[in-house]
């Protein structure tokens, strides 16, 4: 449906903006990155000219990348490159459960448990590739218990439906 496609397109644009913002921040690779035990409330809805969207937290995204040691969570042997600003391997944050579906959950999904670290190739594969279903399935099973610890309950079928898979 056209409305859903429009929402997902805007969701992807917001995620791209997050990626750009993170690229401009100097990251401390020696910091200890970890999950929080706190259940976070839903983020605030921000209105723009066209609709309302949920704000992404860049600190949470950076922490999620750090938890993964700035490597691709599909395969940590995937090639990355060093960022100009700080020499940290470049990976991209991806909300496994897209933020466009935040309304379906009682707590925030803009959390480290829902943000995976991906090499550019795998990130684009999830959005545009033939193997997106495989990648989403792999990540789902790796995150399912982490989701449940944050009172986020979602089936693989439901998650795949968010990606039209």
Where would I find each of the regions flagged by the language model?
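Internal, Lys/Arg-enriched amphipathic helical interaction segments that engage polyanionic partners
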Residues: 1-34
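Generic hydrophobic, helix-prone segments enriched in Leu/Val/Ile
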Residues: 3, 35-39, 62-67, 132-142
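The canonical Cys-X-X-Cys-His
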Residues: 13, 17, 72-75, 122
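Residues that form generic nucleotide/phosphate-binding pockets
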Residues: 21-24, 63, 67, 142, ...
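Short, charged surface segments at domain edges that flank catalytic/cofactor-binding sites
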Residues: 26, 30-88, 100-110
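A detector for short metal-coordination/catalytic motifs
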Residues: 88-93, 97-165
């Amino acid at each position: 449906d056209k409305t859903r496609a429009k929402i997902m397109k805007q969701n992807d644009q917001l995620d791209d903006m997050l990626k750009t913002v993170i690229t401009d921040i100097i990251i401390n690779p020696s910091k200890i990155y970890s999950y929080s035990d706190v259940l976070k409330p839903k983020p605030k809805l921000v209105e723009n000219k066209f609709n309302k969207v949920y704000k992404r937290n860049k600190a949470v995204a950076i922490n999620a990348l750090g938890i993964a040691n700035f490597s691709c969570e599909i395969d940590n042997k995937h090639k990355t490159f060093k960022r100009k600003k700080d020499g940290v391997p470049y990976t991209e944050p991806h909300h496994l459960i897209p933020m466009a579906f935040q309304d379906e959950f009682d707590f925030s999904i803009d959390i480290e448990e829902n943000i995976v670290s991906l090499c550019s190739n795998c990130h684009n594969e999830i959005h545009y590739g033939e193997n997106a279903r495989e990648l989403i399935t792999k990540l789902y099973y790796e995150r399912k218990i982490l989701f449940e610890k944050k009172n986020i309950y979602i089936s693989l079928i439901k998650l795949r439906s968010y990606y039209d898979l």
